[in-house]
Amino acid sequence: MTTGIRNRVKELRTGLGWTQQELADAVGVSRQSINSIERDRYVPSLMLALTFARVFGAPLDQIFSLEDKK
C-alpha cells in the first residue's frame, strides 16, 4: 500500500464559481497547472499549497490530505 495526496481544489474552486483560469490567476500559476493538480497529476509545492489555503480561506488540511492507495 502506498500513500498519496488527495485534494479538494476542484470542489472548492467550483463552489466559488471560479474557472480554472481565475484560480490560476489568484494563486499565480498557469491554468494547465490547476488542471494537473485537480486531476492528481501534479502535487503542488508547500508554498503553492499554502497559497491555495489563503485564497480559499481554508485550513491546509481541508484542501489537501493523505490517503492510502492500494
Positions of the model-derived regions?
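A detector for short, charged/polar N-terminal pre-domain segments
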Residues: 1-4
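Short basic helix-loop element that most often maps to the first helix and adjoining turn
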Residues: 7-26
